Each structure stands twice: as structure tokens, then as C-alpha cells.
Amino acid sequence: MDSNTVSSFQVDCFLWHVRKRFADQELGDAPFLDRLRRDQKSLRGRGSTLGLDIETATRAGKQIVERILEKESDEALKMTIASLSALRYLTDMTLEEMSRDWFMLMPKQKVAGSLCIRMDQAIMDKTIILKANFSVIFDRLETLILLRAFTEEGAIVGEISPLPSLPGHTDEDVKNAIGVLIGGLEWNDNTVRVSETLQRFAWRSSNEGGRPSLPPKQKRKMARTTESEV
């Protein structure tokens, strides 16, 4: 097993522990608590994949961080802070919308890279809006936290989420996954719209109705792909 993979997991475990202690003092806001909950699931998945104990990894991560901080200079800290200042966390959904359980009458699922796409293909003739919570750096989508498809009545009918055991994805991965989800929903004559933040950072171009501008041929291809693969 690669040593960098192990040490990265150890540091992530310790930093999660620090953030958990912060949250236990009721100091974290909703986005902070949401990331904490999802990172916990991710760490459990990674620990299982790597065969590493989280408690032991947390102790080892603490030692690594302490060694780094002992050598940290003020100038290096300033440079790190400057790079972080460009990172933003954008939220279309409330914490309740993100944590709400939902059920599918005709469940369909597809794994695309490190992203899992789920949708209910029993939904027909509805107007659906895609909402997402994600981080942005230098005006580009960096990490998708969660994307969900809602009907006008507020029901959840689709979702794109990172797989805890396969961390890491690009903005193109997210765009492709959104295309698959839209294609699957449109197959049943649903009208799909995209939130303003997703239009700005995930699609870059859209029509006036908030719908991604995809050629009809590409729409049909996505729908067929979803029907056969999801």
C-alpha cells in the first residue's frame, strides 16, 4: 500500500476529529456540520477499503500534523491562507433538504466514476429543478457535496452524490453526471430546470428557462444511455 495514501488517510482522520470537537461545542454552522457528516461517511468507506482502523489512524495523523506545525513559518501560513481565500461553499439546499430520506417507486442507479446517480423513473410529466451544494475555487466547481432533483411540490426524485469509497471528481465528471440525470428524467417527459448556481458553475451556458443548452441529438443519446445503463 502506498505510504502517501496511508498518511493522507491518517491526517484526514485527525482533522475530522478536530472539526468534530469544534462542532461538539455548538460552534459549527449548517454547511460545516453538513461537510462533517459527509466526511465521516467518506472516512469510514476509505478505512474499510484500506483496512485501517480509524482510531489508530487518528492518533498517527495527530503526530504528523504536530510535526508539520512545529516547522510551520508565518510566511508559509500566510500563503496557505491566501490560497484558501478563493474557496467558497455554495448552497442551493437547506440542511433539511440535504438530509431528508426519500424513496423510489422505480429505482434506477448508475455509477459514473466516483459519482452515484439515482433517479425514480416512475416520475412523469413533472417540472423538476436540480439543486446542489458544492464548493467553488477560482470560479470553478471544485467538489460536489450533493445534488438533488426536486418536483415543484418538493418531492425528491433524483440524486447525484460522491461515493465515499472513491473520493475525488472533476467539474467535467459532475457535468457528465448531470447530463445523465437530466436525460433519464426527460425520458418520461419531465421538464428539467437547473438552479442559478449550477448554471453558473457547472454548465456555463443555458437557455432562458434555466435549462442546460444541449442539442436534441445529445438529449436523446443521454436518455437512451440512461434507459439501458442506469
Swiss-Prot record:
PTMs per UniProt: Upon interferon induction, ISGylated via host HERC5; this results in the impairment of NS1 interaction with RNA targets due to its inability to form homodimers and to interact with host EIF2AK2/PKR.
Pfam family, one: Flu_NS1
Residue ranges of the motif Nuclear export signal: 137-146
Chain intervals for the UniProt region annotation (Disordered): 205-230
Cross-referenced InterPro entries: NS1 (IPR004208), NS1A (IPR000256), NS1A_effect_dom-like_sf (IPR038064), uS15_NS1_RNA-bd_sf (IPR009068)
Chief site of localization: host cell
UniProt keyword Transmembrane present: no
Region PABPN1-binding, annotated ranges: 223-230
Region described as CPSF4-binding: spans on this chain: 180-215
Cellular component, GO annotation: host cell cytoplasm; host cell nucleus
GO BP: symbiont-mediated suppression of host cytoplasmic pattern recognition receptor signaling pathway via inhibition of RIG-I activity; symbiont-mediated suppression of host gene expression; symbiont-mediated suppression of host mRNA processing; symbiont-mediated suppression of host PKR/eIFalpha signaling; symbiont-mediated suppression of host type I interferon-mediated signaling pathway
Motif Nuclear localization signal, chain ranges: 34-38
Region (RNA-binding and homodimerization): 1-73
GO molecular function annotations of the record: protein serine/threonine kinase inhibitor activity; RNA binding
Entry keyword set: Eukaryotic host gene expression shutoff by virus, Host cytoplasm, Host gene expression shutoff by virus, Host mRNA suppression by virus, Host nucleus, Host-virus interaction, Inhibition of host innate immune response by virus, Inhibition of host interferon signaling pathway by virus, Inhibition of host PKR by virus, Inhibition of host pre-mRNA processing by virus, Inhibition of host RIG-I by virus, Inhibition of host RLR pathway by virus, Interferon antiviral system evasion, RNA-binding, Ubl conjugation, Viral immunoevasion
Family named by the database record: Belongs to the influenza A viruses NS1 family.
Record's comment describing the protein's domains: The dsRNA-binding region is required for suppression of RNA silencing.
Subunit structure: Homodimer. Interacts with host TRIM25 (via coiled coil); this interaction specifically inhibits TRIM25 multimerization and TRIM25-mediated RIGI CARD ubiquitination. Interacts with human EIF2AK2/PKR, CPSF4, IVNS1ABP and PABPN1.
Functional description taken from the UniProt entry: Inhibits post-transcriptional processing of cellular pre-mRNA, by binding and inhibiting two cellular proteins that are required for the 3'-end processing of cellular pre-mRNAs: the 30 kDa cleavage and polyadenylation specificity factor/CPSF4 and the poly(A)-binding protein 2/PABPN1. In turn, unprocessed 3' end pre-mRNAs accumulate in the host nucleus and are no longer exported to the cytoplasm. Cellular protein synthesis is thereby shut off very early after virus infection.
Protein name, per record: Non-structural protein 1
Taxon lineage: Viruses, Riboviria, Orthornavirae, Negarnaviricota, Polyploviricotina
Record gene name: NS
